[in-house]
Structures are given as structure tokens and as C-alpha cells.
């Protein structure tokens, strides 16, 4: 249990904890679940620079690599206990503590409601999502303040050693899938889903332990090195068509920050969401072209995948709503939003998609 580790860590963290207030300056040390080179960490550093600028240097954030203070699996508990000032991960990492975390971090199949990454942000900003997100931490009984920073999706279905033409082909393969509800949904449709840490994926592919894998989208996937092992890349997937990363600040440390500077941090977080969304479109486009030059074949996901995954996702979502009142409340809020917004948004995006595909065809 995490609490049993606290005493062992406390002595080692005395020097670390000296990041407390000094002359009105709050310095926050924030551990990521990633190493220091990932593009996500770069965006976190950009956020930290904005915070420092908007607070005139009264609040500064230092980003530490994954595992540098506590194991990544203990990160949210360490922030809660005050062993570390803050953490950075994806909200759905904590679905084991509360299933509703998935509806904020990676609502499978667009929460079963046709919500894409941009529509999810509309719900978050304009239809009560932010207030429910703030409530999530109380529901999890955690002394943290969450800051949604990075909408990343849509994520790709993944990388395969050979083409798949149907779900029957997919079911023959061992597939690295996200942990938690997305991975379970794959199992529900008969896919041999395997959960493993990022550092284990490429070795597992090289050794034949797994046959296919997902991680994110073109830029992170290219940087990860999937193209060195696999050549068939399927962009359209439903397990994380919406995916978001966030920062968690210990509640006591947060209360040491003035109300004015807290507001500045929220403004910086809003800017970070825009930066992440807009930068990803361009960066993923550049990375996709690079992958194609390296011999990667871009494939279309079989139609029966969408039918089967959507049905299983809806069953999983309903089961969680039946079992957890707060999950049901969040999902109902998303449904109310979707009933009003998705018919318009999906219709508008349909014409945009056709326009984009027509232009893309001229480039071949």
C-alpha cells in the first residue's frame, strides 16, 4: 500500500520539500510520467513559462522526469500526501481510483455519444465539464487541484505487422492496448489485449510477444520508433478518439498561492489547451509525411471494427453508470451536451472532412 511507503520516503524528501514558499515565491516541483524528451513534456514546460510570466515570477514550476521521485504508479497518491508538489499524466491513468476519470481522460468511443476532441473541449468549457472535473478529485478523496492542459487526440488505432481486413483478422493478433476500460473493451470484442508500459512495447514487438500496438498519434508514434518495427499504420480508432493529459497540484501547496496567481494559472492552462490542440494538428501532419517517406503504409480501419467496438463501449459505459452515481452524473452531462451539439458539429465536420480528403487526393 502507498501509505506504508510514506515513512520510507519522507527522510529522502526533506531536501526536496524545501521547494516551499521563500519570500512569497512558490516553487512547484512536478513529476511527469514521461521522460524529459517527450513532446508532451515540452508543452508542460511551455505552460510553466506562461505561469512564471503571468505571475511575475511568483509561481515557478520545475518539471521532473518520470520515476525521479516516486514510481509513476504512485504519482497521484504522492501528490495527495504532499510528498511531491505536483504530477503530470493522463486523467484516465487514475480510472482504478474512480471510473469517471476515464470520461475526462479518454472517454471511449467519444463517450458513446459521437463526441470528438474539439466537441469534448466545448463540453468542458461551456457545458459544465470543468465544474465536474473539479469535483472529480473530491470524489476520489484526493487533496489535489487538477489543471487540464493537453487535449491530444484523436489517437490512432495502432501499428500492425500485417494488414487487417476485418475483426476476424484483428482477433488473431496480440495487441498492446491502453489499460483499464479501453483495454477491457477490446477484450469484450475478442481481441487479445495486453497492457504494458511504454518502455516495454518495442522490445515486446521485436521478440514477437505482441503482434500490434497502439500509443498515440503520428508525432509521438514516430518519436517512439514504431516505424522501425512495424509498417502498417491504422489512423482511425475509437479507444481514445478523445484523450487528455493534465497536471495535479497538492491542495495545500495550491492554497499557498494567492487568488490572483491561481487565476493566472487557470488562464495559462486554458492557453495550454489551445496550444496543444493547434500544435498537434501541424506536428502530426509533418510526422505523418515523414512516416510515409520511411515506408510506412497508411491503412483504413475495417468497417466492422466500428460496429463491434461501439456496441461494447456503450455496454461498458452503461455498466459503469449503473454502478457509480458520479460516473452517471458526468455521462449524463456529456449526453445532454451531445444531444444539443453533436448533430450540428458532426454535420459541419462531414463537409470539412470531404473537402480535406479531396485536397489530400490531389497530393498523391
Task: Outline where the language-model segments fall.
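Divalent-metal coordination cores built from histidine and acidic residues
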Residues: 119-120, 133
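N-terminal secretory/targeting leader peptides
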Residues: 23-119, 138-364
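Sec/Tat signal peptide C-region and signal peptidase I cleavage site
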Residues: 14-22
Amino acid at each position: 500500500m502507498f501509505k506504508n511507503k510514506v515513512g520510507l520516503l519522507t527522510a529522502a524528501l526533506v531536501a526536496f520539500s524545501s521547494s516551499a514558499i521563500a519570500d512569497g515565491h512558490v516553487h512547484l516541483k512536478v513529476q511527469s510520467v514521461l521522460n524529459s524528451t517527450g513532446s508532451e513534456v515540452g508543452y508542460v514546460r511551455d505552460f510553466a513559462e506562461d505561469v512564471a510570466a503571468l505571475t511575475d515570477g511568483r509561481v515557478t514550476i520545475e518539471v521532473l522526469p518520470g520515476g525521479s521521485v516516486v514510481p509513476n504508479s504512485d504519482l497521484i497518491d504522492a501528490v495527495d500526501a504532499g510528498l511531491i508538489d505536483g504530477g503530470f499524466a493522463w486523467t484516465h491513468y487514475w480510472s482504478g481510483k474512480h471510473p469517471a476519470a476515464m470520461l475526462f481522460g479518454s472517454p471511449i468511443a467519444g463517450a458513446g455519444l459521437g463526441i470528438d476532441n474539439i466537441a469534448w473541449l466545448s463540453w468542458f468549457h461551456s457545458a459544465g465539464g470543468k465544474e465536474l472535473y473539479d469535483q472529480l478529485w473530491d470524489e476520489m478523496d484526493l487533496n489535489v487541484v487538477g489543471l487540464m492542459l493537453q487535449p491530444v487526440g484523436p489517437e490512432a488505432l495502432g501499428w500492425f505487422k500485417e494488414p487487417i481486413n476485418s475483426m476476424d483478422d484483428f482477433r488473431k493478433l496480440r495487441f498492446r492496448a491502453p489499460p483499464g476500460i479501453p483495454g477491457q473493451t477490446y477484450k469484450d470484442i475478442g481481441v487479445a489485449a495486453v497492457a504494458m508500459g511504454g518502455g516495454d512495447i518495442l522490445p515486446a514487438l521485436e521478440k514477437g510477444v505482441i503482434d500490434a500496438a497502439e500509443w498515440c498519434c503520428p508525432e509521438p508514434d514516430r518519436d517512439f520508433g514504431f516505424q522501425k518495427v512495424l509498417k502498417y499504420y491504422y489512423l482511425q480508432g475509437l479507444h481514445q478518439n478523445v484523450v487528455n493529459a493534465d497536471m495535479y497540484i497538492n491542495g495545500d501547496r495550491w492554497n499557498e498561492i494567492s487568488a490572483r496567481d491561481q487565476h493566472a494559472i487557470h488562464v495559462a492552462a486554458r492557453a495550454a489547451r489551445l496550444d496543444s490542440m493547434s500544435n498537434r494538428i501541424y506536428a502530426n501532419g509533418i510526422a505523418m509525411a515523414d512516416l510515409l517517406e520511411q515506408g510506412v503504409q497508411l491503412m483504413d480501419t475495417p468497417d466492422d471494427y466500428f460496429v463491434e467496438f461501439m456496441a461494447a463501449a456503450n455496454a461498458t459505459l452503461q455498466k459503469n453508470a449503473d454502478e457509480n452515481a458520479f460516473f452517471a452524473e458526468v455521462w449524463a452531462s456529456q449526453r445532454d451536451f451531445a444531444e444539443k451539439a453533436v448533430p450540428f458539429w458532426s454535420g459541419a465536420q462531414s463537409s470539412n472532412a470531404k473537402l480535406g480528403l479531396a485536397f489530400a487526393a490531389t497530393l498523391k
